[in-house]
Amino acid sequence: MATMHDKITLQLPAKPEYVSLGRLSLSGIASRAGFSYEAIEDLKIAVSEAITNSVKHAFKGEEDGEITVEYHIYEDKLEVRVSDNGTSFDLETRKQEIGPYEVGEDAEMMRIGGLGLFLIETLMDDVKLYYDEGVSVVMTKYINEKQVEENAKSIST
């Protein structure tokens, strides 16, 4: 198990205008940790999606919501936890409601919802959801792509 070097916590009002603050702080942290430009862009998109999901769904426009973004910096990875204490949801029920997306499906005809989490899972190396008081999304990105391959081998054997 990797040893955590630093933890940075950011408290954001659950308002759309603060999503960029989470993205900007992440960019600086990931750059300092040694991530490539491409990996930083993936991280920024994933974290923006997670924060936006909290703003849009957990608090539904209420003014008093708060989102916590934690950056856990390890020697080989960055773990980002986006948590809210708003309205929770059941992922499996939500997946059934929106149904699967088909290859070649017309983008203009796609249903609204569900793409944010799909995008996060696509861009990150590991994603976990926790339903405590609200929802927490824990996203992990390894600095070295070989680490992802090594972890995959150890899991499959």
UniProtKB/Swiss-Prot annotation:
One Pfam assignment: HATPase_c_2
Listed EC numbers: 2.7.11.1
Keyword Thylakoid (UniProt): no
Catalytic function, reaction form: L-seryl-[protein] + ATP = O-phospho-L-seryl-[protein] + ADP + H(+); L-threonyl-[protein] + ATP = O-phospho-L-threonyl-[protein] + ADP + H(+)
Entry keyword annotation includes ATP-binding: yes
Top-level taxon of the source organism: Bacteria
UniProtKB keywords: ATP-binding, Kinase, Nucleotide-binding, Serine/threonine-protein kinase, Transferase
GO molecular function: ATP binding; protein serine kinase activity; protein serine/threonine kinase activity; sigma factor antagonist activity
InterPro entries: Anti-sigma-factor_SerPK (IPR050267), HATPase_C_sf (IPR036890), RsbW (IPR010193)
Purpose of the protein: Negative regulator of sigma-B activity. Phosphorylates and inactivates its specific antagonist protein, RsbV. Upon phosphorylation of RsbV, RsbW is released and binds to sigma-B, thereby blocking its ability to form an RNA polymerase holoenzyme (E-sigma-B).
Family: Belongs to the anti-sigma-factor family.
Identification of the protein by name: Serine-protein kinase RsbW
